Amino acid sequence: MELYEEWFNNKNYWFSKNFEIDKYLSNKYFTPINNIIFNINDSKKQLITKIILLDQIPRHYQRINPHSNINLFSYSKKASIISELILRKFNNLR
């Protein structure tokens, strides 16, 4: 949940292509991506955090590791599945 707060309190993370930001986010959050456990009973905040982890953090990682073999499409696909769940499960997206 730390990522959720950090992400929404630092909107400069969203669209910047800044090496230091990419490095910081990658070092802090990329490894836990492989440990994500999906639970249909997760809260909205937990699900949104998982979407950020899956959809955004790999992009930051790939920018600082351009020769890595990560599959961004695979991560984004998982994030879109969680997004669909949120849309079905919750009436209010706030």
Please provide the spans of the model-predicted regions.
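Intrinsically disordered, low-complexity activation-like regions
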Residues: 1-94
